Amino acid sequence: MKVYNETLLRNEYAQKMARKWHLEGMLTTEQLAEAQLIHAAVPYNPNLFIKIGLFVFAQACFFFGGSFGFLLVGAGVSFSIVSFLYAIATAFLLVRFIPQKQLHFSGIDNALIYGVIGATMPLIFEIYESLKIDELWIAAALCLPILVLVVYSFGEPLVALGMFLCGLFIVASLLMKNPIGKALLPFALMLYAAGFFIVTRKLSQQPTAFYWKTAIYWLNTTALVVFYAGGNYFVVREANAQLNNLPAPSPEIAFAGLFWGFTFLIPFLYLYGGFRWRDRTLFVLGLLGMVASVLTFRYYHTVLPVEWGMILGGAAATLVAFGVIRQLKMPKYGFSYAPEKDDEERLAIETIVVSQITNNIHSVENGVEFGGGDFAGGGAGEKY
């Protein structure tokens, strides 16, 4: 089941978009106020520093609670059983605590989610050891249902990333059992990543997938990185040498021309996708992939001295950046050099904070007035 209140999440997103459109002049101040009134109920979302503090505090409470529970039960009961029961009890309380306090990735819930997953691991590894099968992918397969359940219920992005990597490890482990599997490993990893990307991208276009929006974004980005790494010549060649215990320098690999093609073709595909779908993630990954491709080529083939390569590369990048900036002074094809409104909003917030600090410095004689705070009392708010 979905633990978080999806209505609150949609209200939070609606307020964010309303503020953005107001900054862009698409909404008047009255319309912004009306939108914020309609979507007034939002989850608790403190600033980053408070999130970190709450995360550390919740983790400490979770570990102290588990230690206290184990001391109460005594040493006569299996640690894995006690840990698993503690995980179930914590999950039961968490499912009721989140709607009551209207949390969403506030630090407390993240810490307890990770704690619940960690508390189930001793029992899973005890089951794995009882099977007496010396295959790590079986342990990963036993963990996978827990991760899938947590991702479905909470949509936690870091757990979703762990789920993706867990499946990747299972696929790689199965293929590495024989020479043919090792030879097909790069293609299998690319297919795995491509399949994940296609499925999650189609899922992200469905209105019902809003609940998992952040997790899907993390999965998409990770799948794109793995897809490129699986086809990169440097990664394939060096991994082949490591897996087969070959001496340095690593020998040439089979289908070298194909992987050289992947090394340079995949970044161009990402760039094309970024332009085609106005996708910043694809565009940035395409640029980073181009840099990685050039470095890969430079690693195996010395064309110019390093100094000349850096000078010419920097000059070319500067000229390209200058030309693109000039062309995009006026928006073209959906692209613009204009700064992001979010950046302007952050700058405005920083200006307000600095002015408030300055005013406080010059008005110390008024005394300290407590009260009015939204978090922890004493006038301390949870956000600027």
Regions found by a protein language model. Name each.
Residues M1-Y384:
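Alpha-helical multi-pass membrane segments and their bilayer interfacial helix-loop junctions
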